[in-house]
């Protein structure tokens, strides 16, 4: 397994975080540390910065710990899901941070390890848990959800047009034997989708696997809590960067942050009170894709969309100190 994978949009991430991380005593959070690629680049680019890395995947944490070991006491790695960031910062005694990075979705390591069950291109156990120490597996979902629940998962999280058809086939086939490995599911999806639909869009199982992964790991629910919590943790002039890999993630990030970028008063109010002014300034115009050059060098960048924002003010009634947190 390659543990020195190339992280996506590294130069752009560093460029966006640069103004915030050059401040004395700067702290940056890598909320999805994975194999440590972005973290390593940030620590090299900013020799004085302290990095707090989170990941729910203990295997990934061990790899990143080895990769970052030479950087010593500037690194804190925590086994945590990113919506637990407030608890992590409280435990570490960190009142605010200067930058937060999210690199969402499944990691290259998780895809490469057959036993994790994320890849539909190889027969493997239907696990798909990012944290293998807890939670139901993809097999549990397939073998226990009824038709309506499975349809909801496939439709909402996979945007699968043939969700009910696939769900019915799953419920019918599991009566003969429970689902345990990915190859059987791939075959079922292929057989459930009309031939015309199978001829475009890549592997027909792609959407089903995405939906199951999101359901197993509660990815969108966690992200909806995590992004506002991360923004709340920023000091004034702190910056947030999010790399998304499908439209569900990207739309959610935009939706939860957008209200902070506009005044919290009616649009026809002639004067905006100070406590109603926006607390967020967008640093990107919409969602930025990777360049053609980056995609040629790193295939994973083909689906990435980047959004970044800066905190421009504290919430009403709270004054943020860029180096000392809330005061």
UniProtKB/Swiss-Prot annotation:
Positions bound to S-adenosyl-L-methionine: 36-38, 55, 89, 103, 110
EC number(s) stated in the UniProt entry for this protein: 2.1.1.199
Gene3D superfamilies in the record: Putative methyltransferase TM0872, insert domain, Vaccinia Virus protein VP39
InterPro entries with a match to the protein in the record: RsmH (IPR002903), SAM-dep_MeTrfase_MraW_recog (IPR023397), SAM-dependent_MTases_sf (IPR029063)
Domain of life per record: Bacteria
Catalytic activity entry: cytidine(1402) in 16S rRNA + S-adenosyl-L-methionine = N(4)-methylcytidine(1402) in 16S rRNA + S-adenosyl-L-homocysteine + H(+)
Pfam families xref list: Methyltransf_5
Keywords of the record: Cytoplasm, Methyltransferase, rRNA processing, S-adenosyl-L-methionine, Transferase
Gene Ontology molecular function terms on file: rRNA (cytosine-N4-)-methyltransferase activity
GO cellular component: cytoplasm
Any single GO BP term: rRNA base methylation
UniProt region (Disordered), positions on chain: 286-327
Cellular localisation: Cytoplasm
Family membership: Belongs to the methyltransferase superfamily. RsmH family.
Protein function: Specifically methylates the N4 position of cytidine in position 1402 (C1402) of 16S rRNA.
This protein's name: Ribosomal RNA small subunit methyltransferase H
Native source species: Parafrankia sp. (strain EAN1pec)
Higher taxonomy: Bacteria, Bacillati, Actinomycetota, Actinomycetes, Frankiales
